[in-house]
Structure formats: C-alpha cells, structure tokens
Amino acid sequence: MAQNEETTEAVEAEETLTSYTSESGAAEAAAPKKERPALTVAGAAVGRRKEAVARVRVVPGSGKWIINGRELANYFPNKLHQQDVNEPFKILDLDGAYDVIARIHGGGPSGQAGALRLGIARSLNEIDIENNRAILKKAGYLTRDARVIERKKAGLKKARKAQQYSKR
C-alpha cells in the first residue's frame, strides 16, 4: 500500500515537471488582477482617419454591430477591415461584451475602418481609463494617424509629379 502511494506521488511529480508551464504564467496566476467595473457603462467618441469621420457609441450588449444602419459584414465585406475594426475589443478581451453603433462618412473603406477603430478605442478608453488606457496606448490604437493626401501644386501634374525635363 505504501509503495502504491509512493509511485502515485512520483507520477504526479513527473507530470508537473513535464507539463507546459512557465514561470511567468505562475507569477501571473499568483498576482491579483484588477477587477474591471461591471459592463454597464456606455462610451462615445469620434475617430478620424484620412477624410473619414466616425461617430461611435459603445454600449454594453451582445457584440452586435450597426454601422450606418447596416451590419459589420455588409458594411465592410473585406475581412481585413473587419479584423482591423475588431482589434481594440480583442486586445482587451472584451469580444462580444459591447454593441457598437456608428455613423461614418467621408473617405474610402480603409480610411473608414481606421476611423472606426480609433473611435472604438477612444470609447473603450473613456469607459475604463485605469485598466484600458495603457493596453490601448501600447498597441497604438489611441493615436490619430495624421497622414493625409498631399495637395496638388500649380505647375505639376500631381502633388510631386513634374513634366519630364531634358537638360540638352
């Protein structure tokens, strides 16, 4: 009987050594996590990119998207834009916790997706600054992309494209 107990203890010790655990994982489990506030607060913000402007409301719900009266998949058929817009929720582990209601105008699909992502990130930041701001800031989702199209200059064909010049 004593021999059986020793072998089971040895097997358990061996399982602990061979299991895929890391020291950092153990440290994270030991450290108490900050409690997030209940998902009852709504947030609203404006996001801009290129010529696009997105007015966004983030409301606690089931993860439903309404963009200009249409679903996310209908408004952004491109999967890349859908993923881009969803990133702030994924990075904060809030996927499906909030409904998004947005009005977007101006620009093209890429600019609109960028504006919507910025608006969502700002809304989530407004909801819970203590927990969300550092994560969103580190990922770069709270930074407004200031790149815009350069204006056309007089005497040139485009912003920088000039007529071909022959020296001789």
Curated annotation (Swiss-Prot):
Residues 1-15 have a biased composition (Acidic residues). This is Small ribosomal subunit protein uS9. It comes from Arthrobacter sp. (strain FB24). Belongs to the universal ribosomal protein uS9 family. The lineage of its organism: Bacteria, Bacillati, Actinomycetota, Actinomycetes, Micrococcales. Keywords: Ribonucleoprotein, Ribosomal protein. GO terms for molecular function: RNA binding; structural constituent of ribosome. GO terms for cellular component: cytoplasm; small ribosomal subunit. It comes from the Bacteria. Residues 1-34 are annotated as: Disordered. The keyword ATP-binding does not apply. HAMAP family: Ribosomal_uS9_B. GO terms for biological process: translation. InterPro entries: Ribosomal_Su5_D2-typ_SF, Ribosomal_uS9, Ribosomal_uS9_bac/plastid, Ribosomal_uS9_CS, Ribsml_uS5_D2-typ_fold_subgr. The keyword Ribosomal protein applies.
